[in-house]
């Protein structure tokens, strides 16, 4: 199946880690990708209020979630966690979304932007930027999750 890039959609990208969630977004023409401050991940999902606020303020129309697959494209334990979080966001936001293989996005961010051993969350948001740039280059359409079936 051939995918085409969505038209006039501003997208939020999430790099979901165990401690923080990196955020980045693009304009509706996919010309610029900007980072947002990373969020501390809370057990009660309190960070969701901030995500929802960014979506409203920036008029974002969909989101992508990075899945850290292994080097053979298989799901890792962290990928399962990211998938669950993405599905939770979909159920709360009701926005189109897609998963993106983010294998090595942190490594690429460290090398490309020269940020190493970062505890502030900057590397997480830079990784979200890399994931979004990758998604824009690959050109997939956002999909809506209906029940357990992705269409």
From Swiss-Prot:
EC number from the UniProt entry: 3.1.-.-
Domain of life assignment: Bacteria
The entry's keywords: Cytoplasm, Hydrolase, Nuclease, Ribosome biogenesis
A single Gene Ontology CC term: cytosol
Record localization: Cytoplasm
GO-annotated molecular function: nuclease activity
Nucleotide-binding keyword on record: no
Covalent S-S links between cysteines: none
SUPFAM superfamilies in the cross-refs: Ribonuclease H-like (SSF53098)
Broadest EC class assigned to this enzyme: hydrolase
SMART domains xref list: YqgFc (SM00732)
Keyword Hydrolase belongs to the record: yes
GO biological process: rRNA 5'-end processing
Reported function: Could be a nuclease involved in processing of the 5'-end of pre-16S rRNA.
Family of this protein: Belongs to the YqgF nuclease family.
The protein's name: Putative pre-16S rRNA nuclease
Organism: Prochlorococcus marinus (strain MIT 9515)
């Amino acid at each position: 199946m051939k995918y085409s890039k969505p038209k006039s959609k501003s997208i939020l990208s999430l790099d979901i880690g165990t401690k923080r969630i990196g955020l980045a977004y693009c304009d509706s023409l996919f010309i610029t990708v900007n980072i947002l401050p990373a969020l501390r991940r809370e057990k009660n999902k309190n960070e969701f209020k901030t995500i929802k606020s960014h979506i409203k303020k920036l008029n974002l129309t969909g989101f992508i979630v990075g899945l850290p697959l292994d080097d053979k494209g298989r799901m890792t334990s962290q990928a399962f966690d990211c998938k669950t979080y993405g599905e939770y966001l979909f159920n709360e936001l009701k926005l189109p979304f897609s998963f993106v293989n983010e294998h090595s996005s942190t490594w690429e961010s460290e090398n490309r932007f020269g940020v190493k051993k970062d505890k502030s969350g900057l590397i997480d948001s830079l990784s979200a930027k890399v994931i979004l740039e990758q998604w824009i280059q690959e050109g997939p359409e956002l999909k809506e999750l209906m029940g357990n079936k992705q269409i």
